[in-house]
């Protein structure tokens, strides 16, 4: 078994999971949404449009990691 097995595979990401940008550490919290991109509160990360990016550093969605509450 490699230390990198399943690296980058998102598991256990629910509609309320908070995710953090791996570049600038900005947190996307579904409860808050994203005022900059006009994303309504209550919008889960999976429902964000593909073109959505970090409001702080412009990193793509793929750079976000699930964090524990």
UniProtKB/Swiss-Prot annotation:
A single Gene Ontology molecular function, please?
Answer: iron ion binding
Q: State its cofactor.
A: Fe(3+)
Q: Which UniProt keywords apply?
A: Electron transport, Iron, Metal-binding, Transport
Q: Binding positions for Fe cation?
A: 21, 24, 54, 57
Q: How is the cofactor bound?
A: Binds 1 Fe(3+) ion per subunit.
Gene3D superfamilies to which the protein is assigned, alphabetical: 2.20.28.10
Q: Which superkingdom is the protein from?
A: Bacteria
Q: Where is the Rubredoxin-like domain?
A: 16-67
Free-text function comment from the UniProt entry: Could be an electron transport intermediate in hydrogen oxidation.
Q: Which family does the record assign?
A: Belongs to the rubredoxin family.
PANTHER family recorded for this chain?
RUBREDOXIN, RUBREDOXIN-1-RELATED
This chain belongs to the protein called Probable rubredoxin HupI
**Organism in which the protein naturally occurs:** Bradyrhizobium diazoefficiens (strain JCM 10833 / BCRC 13528 / IAM 13628 / NBRC 14792 / USDA 110)
Question: Could you read off the lineage of the organism from its UniProt record?
Answer: Bacteria, Pseudomonadati, Pseudomonadota, Alphaproteobacteria, Hyphomicrobiales
Name the gene behind this protein.
hupI
């Amino acid at each position: 078994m490699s230390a990198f097995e399943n690296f980058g595979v998102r598991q256990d990401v629910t509609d309320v999971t908070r995710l953090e940008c791996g570049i600038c550490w900005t947190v996307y919290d579904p409860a808050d949404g994203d005022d900059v991109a006009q994303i309504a509160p209550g919008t889960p990360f999976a429902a964000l449009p593909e073109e959505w990016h970090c409001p702080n550093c412009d990193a793509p969605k793929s750079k976000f990691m699930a964090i524990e509450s």
